[in-house]
Amino acid sequence: MDAVPLATPEEAWRIAKSLNYRHIGGTVVAVVQDVETGEVLMVGHMDPVAVVLTLTTGLAHYYSTSRKRIWLKGETSGHYQIVKEFRTDCDGDAVVLKVVQIGAACHTGARSCFSSPASFKIRLNRDA
């Protein structure tokens, strides 16, 4: 696995402290994309410690809002995410991780959590 730290611990904490953890459980939303294709693979949550671990190890870490703990993506499945880019949005309450996905991103075994077609159709009323 070719994970490379994206920041020193000091830089990582500076970045983590600059974010706005206003979402569930004191987290930022993390949108995960394939670095080559831009495909959205999953959405997760990160607390400050998950941000620091991600930046200092180069492997995606998340905060489980249900289990109330940090987890390393791939810790049980081996389906790691090697982080190549870490971006913050203008409000500091969301981040984008551009990753090399090892195996499936979704717990169902699918490459992406967004691979199922929508179960409903939306019709636009062009006359309105």
Swiss-Prot record:
Q: Which UniProt keywords apply?
A: Amino-acid biosynthesis, Cytoplasm, Histidine biosynthesis, Hydrolase, Magnesium, Metal-binding, Zinc
- Return the cofactor note field: Binds 1 Mg(2+) ion per subunit. Binds 1 zinc ion per subunit.
Could you say which enzyme class this protein belongs to?
hydrolase
Q: Does the keyword tRNA-binding apply?
A: no
* Pathway stated in the Swiss-Prot or TrEMBL entry: Amino-acid biosynthesis; L-histidine biosynthesis; L-histidine from 5-phospho-alpha-D-ribose 1-diphosphate: step 3/9
- Quote the subcellular location field of this record: Cytoplasm
State the needed cofactors, names only. Answer: Mg(2+); Zn(2+)
| Reaction(s) catalysed by this chain's protein | 1-(5-phospho-beta-D-ribosyl)-5'-AMP + H2O = 1-(5-phospho-beta-D-ribosyl)-5-[(5-phospho-beta-D-ribosylamino)methylideneamino]imidazole-4-carboxamide
| InterPro entries named in the record | PRA-CH (IPR026660), PRib_AMP_CycHydrolase_dom (IPR002496), PRib_AMP_CycHydrolase_sf (IPR038019)
- From its record, what is one biological process in GO terms? L-histidine biosynthetic process
- Where does the protein principally reside? cytoplasm
Q: Where does Zn(2+) bind?
A: C90, C106, C113
One Gene Ontology cellular component term attached to this UniProt record is: cytoplasm
- Residues annotated as binding Mg(2+) are D89, D91, D93
GO MF term set: magnesium ion binding; phosphoribosyl-AMP cyclohydrolase activity; zinc ion binding
Q: Which family does it belong to?
A: Belongs to the PRA-CH family.
Q: What NCBIfam families would the database entry show?
A: PRK00051.1
What is said about its interaction partners and assembly?
A: Homodimer.
- Please explain the role this protein plays, according to its UniProt record: Catalyzes the hydrolysis of the adenine ring of phosphoribosyl-AMP.
Q: Which HAMAP family match?
A: HisI (MF_01021)
This chain's protein is named Phosphoribosyl-AMP cyclohydrolase
Gene name for this UniProt entry: hisI
